[in-house]
């Protein structure tokens, strides 16, 4: 299990006003969280107070991440990749552009997210919950990735999710929200609307070890 940095550059390119989000008079945090957890239009493309405020495909934004992943994991000639909690699956799309022979699969609980994925890969995506057994055989994928999904699960749901990533993938990569100090913990608690598992780095590493996950991991922080 190794820490590897793929996503933080993209994450840190966005400016966030933590107090403005938590003190928004039109969308108090409880109201915003309730809307966000419907995983529909509001979550992806609605008001910024609810989540992304417009999650659009931007050419090249995910290309560098895709290139670095392809290079790092030394994928075989006809690789298979699964994205757990893929959302609009822009990273899968960029990886497919780099490797036309790549066989991709992705699932999410958001109908809106999947419906707004790139048309070229939409047939490879489907509705499924990350905390339920995956419909695949052991070691079916050369790489299983999950970005910003598992912190939305409760602790007992993480056991199944991490075990399934370990089971169906020869290699794994999981990115989650975390914190290293009191300020980052406060910022995360202000910002996060769908997070169920608020753990620091050491706690997440304990969870990985306790539930038998041996793949790579990354944390994003709210500085």
What is each PLM-predicted segment?
Residues 145:
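A conserved beta-strand element that flanks and buttresses the S-adenosyl-L-methionine
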Residues 1-73, 77-137, 153-167, 171-223:
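Class I (Rossmann-like) S-adenosyl-L-methionine-dependent methyltransferase catalytic domain
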Residues 149:
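Hydrophobic adenine-recognition pocket in adenosine-nucleotide-binding enzymes
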């Amino acid at each position: 299990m190794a820490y590897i940095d793929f996503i933080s550059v993209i994450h840190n390119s966005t400016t966030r006003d933590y107090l403005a989000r938590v003190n928004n008079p039109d969308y108090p945090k409880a109201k915003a969280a309730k809307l966000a957890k419907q995983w529909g239009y509001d979550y992806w493309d609605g008001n910024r107070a609810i989540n992304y405020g417009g999650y659009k495909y931007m050419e090249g934004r995910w290309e560098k991440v895709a290139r670095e992943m392809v290079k790092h994991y030394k994928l075989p000639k006809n690789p298979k990749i699964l994205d757990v909690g893929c959302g609009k699956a822009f990273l899968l799309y960029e990886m497919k552009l780099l490797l036309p022979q790549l066989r991709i699969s992705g699932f999410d609980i958001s109908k809106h997210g999947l419906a707004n994925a790139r048309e070229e890969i939409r047939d490879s995506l489907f509705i499924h919950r990350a905390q339920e057994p995956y419909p695949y055989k052991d070691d079916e994928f050369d790489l299983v990735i999950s970005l910003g999904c598992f912190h939305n699960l409760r602790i007992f749901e993480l056991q199944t999710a991490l075990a399934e990533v370990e089971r169906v993938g020869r290699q794994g990569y999981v990115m989650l929200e975390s914190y290293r100090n009191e300020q980052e913990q406060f910022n995360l608690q202000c910002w996060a609307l769908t997070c169920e598992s608020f753990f620091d780095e050491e706690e997440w590493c304990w969870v990985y070890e306790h539930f038998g996950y041996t793949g790579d991991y990354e944390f994003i922080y709210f500085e």
